[in-house]
Amino acid sequence: SSAQPLSLEEIQKLLAQDCLHLVCAVDEDERILGMLSLVVFDIPTGRRAWIEDVVTDQAARGQGVGQGLVDAAVEHARELGAKTVDLTSRPTREAANRLYRRVGFLQRETNVYRKSF
């Protein structure tokens, strides 16, 4: 599902979290072409990372923006000491799923559950 636009205050609150890293791709005029959220956190089995909210501008699709974002996020997670990087993607997002496999993500044999409030 798509998120509603955020206010400046909401963005500042997100960015104040130590665990959240926003990865952005910009063009030569500093226009945002895409972005993703990288969350890095510690649990008893080690430091982990999670990629969420991968978004690429419609006009920039097919130009390597998504791959650049994912590659940068994975490298940043590695630099921060994460043992793994996880993400989810709907089966209907065929291009995104091809990208994730191409850059080395493996589909896990698990179920993902969610409880919404």
Q: What does each model-identified segment do?
A:
Residues 70, 77-89:
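Conserved GNAT acetyl-CoA-binding A-motif
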Residues 1-46, 70-71, 76, 107, ...:
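Acetyl-CoA-dependent GNAT
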Residues 47-58:
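Conserved acetyl-CoA binding element of GNAT-fold acetyltransferases
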Residues 56, 62-75, 98-103:
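Conserved acetyl-CoA-binding loop-helix of GNAT-fold acetyltransferases
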Residues 67, 79, 91-109, 114-115:
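Conserved active-site alpha-helix within GNAT-family acetyltransferase domains
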Residues 41-43, 59, 92:
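Short coil/turn motifs at secondary-structure junctions
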